[in-house]
Regions:
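Short, acidic/polar
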Residues: 20-32, 174-180, 290-299
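N-terminal beta1-alpha1-beta2 module of alpha/beta enzyme domains
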Residues: 1-71
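Active-site mouth loops of central-metabolism enzymes
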Residues: 9-24, 78-86, 163-173, 281-290
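Flexible, glycine-rich active-site loops centered on histidine and acidic residues
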Residues: 2-19, 81-147, 189
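Hydrophobic faces of well-ordered beta-strands that scaffold small-molecule active sites
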Residues: 5-9, 41-43, 73-75, 103-107, ...
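An alpha-helical appendage that flanks or caps ligand/catalytic pockets
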Residues: 126-158, 199-306, 333-356
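Conserved, mostly hydrophobic/aromatic
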Residues: 5, 33, 37, 45, ...
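A conserved active-site cap/scaffold subdomain adjacent to cofactor or substrate pockets
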Residues: 175-198, 203-204
């Protein structure tokens, strides 16, 4: 069965442009992905990141879902420690009520920002050091399932809308920790190979081997998220990859400005030490023309036993991002309006409705 192809859009701001332009580009690209037959598009949560326009994925989700007709739209993801589980439950129940069967909720454990900004989000030093992600996840699930113990102080709280369940839940991660937690909870799992490509195979295999079936997910479902740099030719792709290199170098040194342009990256005098540091970083982008990138991605997806591939790119220019979306749709042989996992998610939705009933 062909693997579904999905899109992670970080809503990057290229040097010399505005956040408004970045958001409008993301809308246009989502409409394009919808027309080409992509299965889902996700938006991330980042704070105090001047190079990224989306700090509130739930707002992007509502707008994009209203502008598209078939595409699933979700958070990739909401950083659970930054928010009260009750608030997340009510926000995504409402999104599900507005767009039934088209919303995804991906959950992450990282702050999505620096320490000071995380403190501003969480309001206490204790919250910064607490390793309570599993407890927060359990609380979110208990709110949705009305499954708090009889003596729990939250047992009488009913998230609104009360007659709508949460959409399908996914845990996001770049390590074995999140893979095991997703498996034990019987949830979907999305591995961030664009952050840690080397860890994809062991984490996804561990998830599948440890999976405990649940009413939400009778079977495991693993998404492999990869960064791709797709050029018109191999040489063009290698030229574009200079943007990735300069971006990674800036991220490593804490420079969080707008994404560099190709001209800016081409002028930068990389030292041998900087080249070595970039090569040693676990973040990786598959570079080449569309056929070369497809071959590399397919090989990793086969090795990791991924059920679905999700592509993103660190290239900020709209034309480069548009080419990536079009070319990946071509080499993955997408057919607009057809989804190879519609039946699977129909089963998941039916199970969720059975819980609600």
């Amino acid at each position: 069965m062909p693997r579904p192809l999905s899109l992670l859009d970080l809503t990057p701001i290229v040097a010399g442009s505005s956040s408004g332009e970045a958001v409008r580009t993301s809308v246009d690209l989502a409409v394009l992905a919808d027309q080409l037959g992509y299965h889902r598009v996700w938006y991330a949560e980042h704070h105090n990141s001047p190079g990224l326009a989306s700090g509130a994925p739930e707002i992007m989700i509502e707008h994009i879902a209203s502008r598209t007709s078939r595409l699933r739209v979700g958070a990739g993801g909401v950083m659970l420690p930054n928010h009260a589980p009750l608030k997340i439950a009510e926000t995504f129940r409402l999104l599900e009520a507005l767009h039934p069967g088209r919303i995804d909720l991906g959950l992450g454990r990282a702050p999505g920002t620096d320490t000071i900004t995380a403190f501003a989000m969480r309001r206490s030093a204790e919250a910064l050091t607490a390793d309570d992600y599993p407890e927060l996840l359990a609380e979110l699930l208990a709110f949705d399932d009305q499954a708090f113990p009889a003596d729990h102080p939250f047992r009488t709280i009913r998230p609104v809308p009360v007659d709508t369940k949460l959409p399908p839940l996914w845990l996001l991660g770049s390590s074995d920790f999140s893979a095991r937690l997703a498996a034990e909870a019987g949830l979907g799992f999305a591995f961030a190979a664009h952050i840690n490509a080397r860890g994809a195979v062991p984490a996804l295999r561990d998830y599948r081997a440890s999976f405990v079936p649940s009413e939400r997910y009778p079977e495991p479902w693993a998404i492999l998220t990869v960064s791709v740099t797709v050029g018109e030719t191999s040489d063009h792709a290698r030229e574009l990859s200079l943007i990735n290199d300069l971006l990674l170098l800036r991220l490593r040194s804490g420079q969080l400005g707008a994404y560099p342009t190709l001209e800016e990256a081409g002028r930068y005098p990389f030292t041998a030490a900087e080249r070595q540091m970039i090569a040693s970083m676990p973040m990786r982008s598959f570079v080449g023309d569309a056929e070369e990138v497809h071959r590399q991605v397919r090989e990793l997806a086969d090795q990791s036993q991924a059920d679905e591939v999700m592509v993103t790119t660190f290239l900020p220019e709209p034309d480069d991002r548009r080419r990536m979306i079009v070319e990946m749709a071509r080499v993955f042989e997408l057919t607009a309006g057809w989804s190879p996992i519609a039946a699977r998610e129909s089963v998941t939705t039916s199970a969720s409705q059975a819980i609600a009933g």
